[in-house]
């Protein structure tokens, strides 16, 4: 009996010592959160937000991405879209005159940007070309045509239209001006009212060239005749 009692007491003492040792080894409550490094994210805490870039530091690529994001998020009106993203206007073939190819071009260029080259006659300076084409642009503006103008030479300018459907009407106006030598539209050159002087000068030059060639031929034939006569005398 004494031995069994002593054995039970020994077991109790060992269990108590093991429990005390376990309590000493365990960290106090809340110490895990305190010991966690502030720089390492916990599973329960959300990741830190990425710092936004200052808009003053944006480059061209950042602005392009921002514009693309706006286009995705916002409903942009059809007229504000870039030209290559606008849907093509439907062509009504019932209004096309087969005998007039220009009518087909007008329908296909509707709502599209179009450029035409205009040449001023009379060998003007760049300043004179600026003044003359400015008057033409003003007349078109008064007729409710939206036209932009760019000087590209001493006697040449570009007229740019946002709606190519009206290009041929503007061409008809320009070729009727006294100082318009010609208009180039869609690869086609249309002579203007002021282009006659160039044709006259060209005709005069051709006549003078032919006259010189004729004089040279007559001189050479005379020299040949003289040489032949000398040979016969010998």
Swiss-Prot record:
Its main location: endoplasmic reticulum. Residues 165-204 are annotated as: Escort domain. Glycans are attached at residue 201. A motif (Prevents secretion from ER) lies at residues 231-234. Pfam families: Mesd. Residues 196-234 have a biased composition (Basic and acidic residues). It is found in: Endoplasmic reticulum. Residues 1-33 form the signal peptide. The keyword Endoplasmic reticulum applies. Residues 1-164 are annotated as: Chaperone domain. One of its GO terms (molecular function) is low-density lipoprotein particle receptor binding. Belongs to the MESD family. Monomer. Interacts with LRP5; the interaction prevents LRP5 from forming aggregates and chaperones LRP6 to the plasma membrane. Interacts with LRP6; the interaction prevents LRP6 from forming aggregates and chaperones LRP6 to the plasma membrane. Interacts with LRP4; the interaction promotes glycosylation of LRP4 and its cell-surface expression. This is LRP chaperone MESD. It comes from Pongo abelii.
